[in-house]
Amino acid sequence: MKQSLIDITPKMGVRTPVYPGDPPFVVRLTASVAAGDPADVSAVSFSAHCGAHVDAPAHLFPGTGDAASLPLERFVGPCLVIDLTELEPEAAPSELVRLQTIAAVKALMDGKALPSRVLIKTRRSQPPVWSSDFRALSPECVEAFLAEGVELVGVDVPSIDPADSEELLAPVSYTHLTLP
């Protein structure tokens, strides 16, 4: 079987939506050929939650590992891509991804186990501005992934928890502690 590397990273730029209150994506020219410098040089700054990112354990648990401490092997290798835009095209933008969805995916796999990495596509395009309308994962869905031995779940939305969640619905042990 031919293997390929698929880059799922969304494009980032000054129009990249950011979580309310987070600093925006900024590109600043720090040196310029036009101003007599030997080269154009830019500085880029943005929130750690901008674009594709991983929440390291230290995000919620001070004194634990940061993103640099996570093994690269966790993020590279075989994975299953679940395209909910095809599987559930009528789902509302803010509808939770439920256990039934994972059961339907497993049924399509003819008894094969889920791989250790799962990516979930929930929308057809990125909104031009921040939107709290996105498909988060239900706690039961996350527990099912845990039970199946899934070590990494990637989503194309800002969080696996709903934007208006006052507490994390998904088990914290899964979303943050299983990464190291």
Could you tell me what each predicted segment is?
Residues 61-78:
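Structural signature of FAD isoalloxazine-binding scaffolds in flavoprotein oxidoreductases
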Residues 8, 53, 82, 118, ...:
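Divalent metal-coordination and catalytic microenvironments
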Residues 134-140, 167-170:
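Charged helix-capping and loop-helix junction motifs
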Residues 175-180:
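Conserved small/polar residues in nucleotide/adenosyl-binding loops
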Residues 57, 126-127, 159-166:
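Active-site environment of divalent metal-dependent phosphoester hydrolases
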Residues 44-61, 157:
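Histidine-centered catalytic micro-motifs
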Residues 1-36, 148:
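Generic N-terminal segment detector
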Residues 83-127, 133-137:
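Glycine- and Gly-Pro-enriched alpha-helical subdomains that act as flexible
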